[in-house]
Each structure stands twice: as C-alpha cells, then as structure tokens.
Amino acid sequence: MIEQLNEILNSFKTKLKSVKDLNDWEELKKEFIGKDSNLTTILKSIKTISNEQKQEIGKLANQIRTTIIDNLNNKQEELKNKELLIKLEKEKIDVSLKNSSLKFGSKHVLNIVIEEISDIFTEIGFEMVSGTEIESDLYNFQKLNLPLDHPARDMQDTFYLDNNLVLRTHCTNMTSRMLTKLASLKTDDNNLAVISYGNVYRRDDDDATHSHQFMQIDGFVVGNKISFANLKWILKYMCQRLFNKDINIRLRPSYFPFTEPSVEVDVSCFKCDSKGCFICKKTGWIEILGAGMINEHVLKLNGLDPTKCSGLAFGIGIERIAMLKFNISNIRNFYENNVKFLEQFKFYSE
C-alpha cells in the first residue's frame, strides 16, 4: 500500500505539469482527491488494516493528500492569474485614440453659490476658512453659549459620536475656534472678519425641503464699536449682490443662543417685486437667513473682553439660496447626481 501511495503522488506530479487551463485542473482534482479517487479509496480502507500498519500508512496517506491539495491550490491561482492577463490583453484600450463624443463636466450648483457668496465677502476683507466636520461638544455648543443642560440644544437634533465629539450642527463652530484663537494672541487689535463654509449635519427626516446633511456659510466680524448698523449694511450689501437687484431687507426679532439681539432676515421678493407670488407665499417677503450681534457671553467664553470689543454674526443655508436663485423645488435634487439636472447650470460655471 505504501508503494501504491508513492505511485499516486508521482503520477500526480507528472500530470500536474501538463495542466493548461482550469478545465484540466478540475479533471486532475477529481482524479486524485475526488470521492472515487484511488487516494480516497485507500483512506477509507485504512480502518481494515492491522494496527501496526494503520499509523504508518494513515500518516503517509494524509501527508500525500495535503501535498496534492497544496499543489492544486497553487496551480489554480497560477491559472486564474494567467486567464486574467489574457482577458486584460484582449480588452486593452488604446488611450491615445481621440473621442469626439467626450463630455466635459461643470461645477456643481452648490459650488457655484458658495463661490459667489465667497467672492462677495472676500472683496470686502473677509477671511475664508473651512474647518472640521467632526467637532468637539466644547466648540460646537459650550463656547457658543449652549452648556450641557441648555434647553436650546433641542433646537438641533445632533449626531453624537464617541469621546464628546459630534458631527457639527452648524459652521458656527469655526466662530468659536477663531474667537478663541484671536483671544490667545493677547493683542489690543481685536479686529477680525471671517466666513466659514462646509457641510453640517442634523437628524432631520429627508424630504423636499430638509436633509440630514446640508451646507452653510457662517460669517462674523469682531472689533471695536461693531454695531447693529454694520450688521444691517453687510446683510443688505450681500443680498443685493447675491440676487442682482436693488432689493430691500426686513429684520424680524428672533432667538439664537449665540447672538443677542437676534434677527431673521427677509428680502423683498425678487420674483414678483413684492406683489405676492407662490415663492413668497403672497407676503412679498422671503425668509433667507439668521443673524445678530454676538452675545457677550460668547465673547467671554472664548476669552475676549466684551467691554473692549463687540461683534456681529450671520448664517446662510447654501441650498436655501440655490433653491431661490434657480427655482429648485426639491433639496434632494442637489445630491442625486442626476446629470440632466446638473447640466442646466453649466452656463453659470463657465
């Protein structure tokens, strides 16, 4: 039986050399380790031989079977790689060929709006930053006058992560970071104007006007004797530049934890000249953003002295502006990668 086992191994090695493809490989596998193979028959018959031979023959038979399986696996990998190379060679593409039907992409409509707003503010001296989308509770809430037990935290359903981290609920997190950085400089020159932009996240149910992820631009100015009149001028200047019309703005009292006083900013309807339409809901006004004077507590929490400086702040929803500018009714259109929808804005990106 030992001679028979050695003959099986030698025969396998000889036939393995002649295997050219996976079909040959399958036949070889069936012949040497299949259920009807000689090796399998020997392994089944070991229980019938004497105890003296059982250990020696059983050990040798299993070693040969392991050797055959290892060689089959290596050969299979070799054949698969060979077939892949042949397939790749057949499918090789000549990248030097010209394609007359090549289509060029364009800027996404949200990037168009971001660049337009950024240009408006950088032209009047604002610095532009982006910041991090994963933020600490400290900068996202606590340094913005939203301590752990503040009821206003319920205004924003938050995605909480581990280790007191959150997905930022607003770009105002960069306001607290930049104010803290300004305070660390310990200088008498507390003048700073910054806009920050990027994705923000809230646990909203997605529908035509809401999304769990959307984009914002936040801005703030701090310095000596910054007043509400400065805020009103900035807001009107931005709205007139953004909508390319001599529109009016209306400020309504509101509440934001990090500003006092706080206002909701409406613009006179640029679609119907304030006569009343479906865009402005027959009111002649369109709600567009929130703003206010930076709360004194926020200045203190970030290391600044409210007796020596003051500030203003505002927050703009990018999707909101894009929907108004381009008559888009469903916020989900921005994120569905529908080429027909996106191609409409190619003209604006050229």
From Swiss-Prot:
Q: Where does Mg(2+) bind?
A: E260
Gene3D superfamilies from the xrefs?
Bira Bifunctional Protein, Domain 2 (3.30.930.10)
Localization of this protein? Cytoplasm
Obligatory cofactor(s): Mg(2+)
| A UniProt-annotated Pfam family | Phe_tRNA-synt_N
Q: Which InterPro entries match?
A: aa-tRNA-synth_II, aa-tRNA-synth_II/BPL/LPL, Phe-tRNA-synth_IIc_asu, Phe-tRNA_ligase_II_N, Phe_tRNA_ligase_alpha1_bac, Phenylalanyl-tRNA_Synthase, tRNA-bd_arm
- Matching PROSITE patterns, A to Z? AA_TRNA_LIGASE_II
Write down how the cofactor binds this protein. Answer: Binds 2 magnesium ions per tetramer.
EC number, as in UniProt: 6.1.1.20
Q: Would you tell me the Gene Ontology cellular component terms?
A: cytoplasm
Which SUPFAM superfamilies did the record assign? Class II aaRS and biotin synthetases, tRNA-binding arm
Could you provide one GO biological process annotation from this protein's UniProt record? phenylalanyl-tRNA aminoacylation
Q: Which GO terms describe its molecular function?
A: ATP binding; magnesium ion binding; phenylalanine-tRNA ligase activity; tRNA binding
Keyword terms:
Aminoacyl-tRNA synthetase, ATP-binding, Cytoplasm, Ligase, Magnesium, Metal-binding, Nucleotide-binding, Protein biosynthesis
Q: Which HAMAP family does the protein's record reference?
A: Phe_tRNA_synth_alpha1 (MF_00281)
Q: How does it assemble?
A: Tetramer of two alpha and two beta subunits.
Protein name (database record): Phenylalanine--tRNA ligase alpha subunit
Per UniProt, what is the name of the gene that codes for the protein in this document? pheS
